[in-house]
Amino acid sequence: MQTSNFRKKNAAEVDFFMGYGDVNRYEVLEVIGKGSYGLVCSANDIHTGEKVAIKKIHNIFEHISDAARILREIKLLRLLRHPDIVEIKHIMLPPSKMDFRDIYVVFELMESDLHQVIKANDDLTREHYQFFLYQMLRALKYIHTANVYHRDLKPKNILANANCKLKICDFGLARVAFTDAPTTVFWTDYVATRWYRAPELCGSFYSKYTPAIDIWSIGCIFAEVLIGKPLFPGKNVVHQLDLITDLLGTPSLDAISQVRNDKARKYLTCMRKKQPASFSHKFLKADPLALQLLRKLLAFDPKDRPSAQEALADPYFNGLAKVEREPSCQPIPKMEFEFERRRATKEDIKELIFQEILEYHPQLLKEHISGTERPNFHHLSVVDQFRKQFTQVEENLNGSGAAVSLQRKHSSLPRSTIVHSAAIPAKDYKHVASSSTKLAVDGSWNAQIQGVHANIAGEPSTIVRPAVSSERSLAPTLQWQPNMTHFLNHALCYQNTVFSGSLLDATGPAQAIPRTTPYVDYRSGNLDLYQHHVSREDVQSDTATAQAHAASHGPVPAVSYSLPGTYRIT
């Protein structure tokens, strides 16, 4: 009886893929996000072997404004292909062209977001700060050269992997400008974005905007990375302006004239004179060059803020990469967003979303364009094989209450990638970080990175999770063998594996163990490995000591996160 009630209660969510094409391509693993929009599940792509995130967006046509936002986002993510922007890998084909209500969008999987990284790490280094900002600006350069303004940049909209890779996501509020003149548009989602909104937009719902608004947001995010908390957590518009002027000083009358809201402009005009605060006192121990650039990014007057390309050329990034090699994007054709320039009906939006889905089904798109398509696409249902899987993940979620990490309701979660300094062409991008990657150690050890086992000299050895306190998480541990001396592949850094063996036993031999720590080569922007030795005493001591020892022998270790089921040195 209890089972029967459970099935009735969860019937809508159990039939996760009901009637949709391509469902036999994916194996659902677990629920990783749940919100008003629907569900996000992690899954295995059986065709490629990759782990992906499948976002089910339900009842998308209930409100036309929501449908338009979804259309805008999937269209922009198709047009903006860049390593620093989250990628849509696939959109499932609905069972019927005009009778569908839900869509299933397959994203690359990322581990966390910058909000969680800032929250969980109090030991980020100058190299982390520099590389994080560089990636954000590199993405912004690409976005802005396409004449797109994100308009909702904040730490939760910047996804992160343990190899320090960042990707901008959530383009639902983005806008495309088709002239060089400032564009006036209605600004929604005001409260959620206040802390990262440029001062010229404070208190204004209809606002003119330029690329400078995104630059301000990046400055706020970078400052938050530096100090570990939001820079301007205003409770309302007046408080927001107070916090901004406490740091930057009273703006000039010319800068105040850029503020769109009459009351905000009057408040700033009548404000007592404030001197700028010392950035070196506010951001203790920060690189002086970083603070010089931050002050430019946070210029009160939008005309004084640098473009993303100008910021990339700042001395702060000297030696990191060549700015001229960082890619630009062709401006987006006006016809792609014609629906925003006219009063589109629900049927118009549905047809346009269906056309976007067909972009991921080339043969059907060809038929659609030529007019030879079938009126409806009915697919053989293979829901039964998903029913059990989805029931299980739902049962875990509802039964334990904390079986999965639901605090990050983002559409994209983990994928093992390598940081690239230049953009990857769209046709090559799918080949990055193949899931079949293996390591060769002295020609005798092959470890399957994304699995749960390793074969050492032909003998299986199980990865075990070390016993740790609730306050500390460790890396997956492999039994160390004397022949493990060389690590030849970047893929290992995704797991942050620590090697242990009899040397950890007080009675074992006092020999050094090889340990490979991932780091980012900040001159080239590529992820690399640094091999060194950690003594038995180091390993037996607190892991933070071992981490410090490792850091003193080379570049910074990879970032650590606090995700359930993820084990690493912290």
Swiss-Prot record:
GO biological process, one term: intracellular signal transduction
Cellular compartments per GO CC: cytoplasm; nucleus
Pfam families with a match to the protein in the record: Pkinase (PF00069)
SMART domains, alphabetized: S_TKc
Enzyme Commission (EC) number: 2.7.11.24
Transmembrane intervals: none
Catalytic activity: L-seryl-[protein] + ATP = O-phospho-L-seryl-[protein] + ADP + H(+); L-threonyl-[protein] + ATP = O-phospho-L-threonyl-[protein] + ADP + H(+)
Annotated residues for binding of ATP: 32-40, 55
Protein origin, superkingdom: Eukaryota
GO molecular function: ATP binding; MAP kinase activity; protein serine kinase activity; protein serine/threonine kinase activity
Active site: 152
Keywords: ATP-binding, Kinase, Nucleotide-binding, Phosphoprotein, Serine/threonine-protein kinase, Transferase
PTM annotation: Dually phosphorylated on Thr-188 and Tyr-190, which activates the enzyme.
Entry keyword annotation includes Kinase: yes
Residue positions where Phosphotyrosine is found in the record: 190
Gene3D superfamilies (UniProt xref): Phosphorylase Kinase, domain 1, Transferase(Phosphotransferase) domain 1
Domain statement: The TXY motif contains the threonine and tyrosine residues whose phosphorylation activates the MAP kinases.
Protein's recorded name: Mitogen-activated protein kinase 11
